[in-house]
Amino acid sequence: MSEVQILLLLLLSGYLISVSLGMVIIPRILVISHKKRLYDVPDSRKVHTTPVPRLGGLSFFPVVLMSFALVIGFRLYLWPSDLSSFSIEMLHEYLFLFVGMTLLYLVGFCDDLVGVGYRYKFIVQVVSALLLVLSGNWLDTLGGLFGIYSVPALLGVPVTVFAVVYVTNAINLIDGIDGLASGLCCIALSVLSVFFLDRKSVV
């Protein structure tokens, strides 16, 4: 198989694994929400008129993590001689990234259950963004946009932290309308998938 075919297969596998796990896990989480009466009560920012279970999002991060691990595992197991899109040197990037994602996930979970003050959420968001920077992923180039190819760290790091915190809060704000946040995220991730495929990168 060519590298493009392998990447397409892995992307499709990741999608199918995520959907399958979500279909198995989410209904069981909703049962718990109903039993414990953990509901999202309607207010002026939300479109639903009756209380709905709040823990549906609890499955998202574990599903993403398991899908990612399985896809990378299959990649290393089935095609060990062709690892141009993955190397052990990238491991520290994933570790920092997953720690930051875990922090955001835990704060979101606690916020759903008991509520978390905006100051604490902001601090965790900044820490998570800094962990992303520590993984080596920060805005260091605009790819020629406006004639800019290189962005210094003194500018790129703060802009990256601001962007992560901004997008995190933006998604949280629009999450009150059913399907809006997930739809926008699906569109964004689809575009990113095309870019990754064009660069022959599995992640």
Residue ranges and their predicted role:
Residues 2-203:
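"…together with the soluble PPM/PP2C metallo-phosphatase catalytic core" -> "…together
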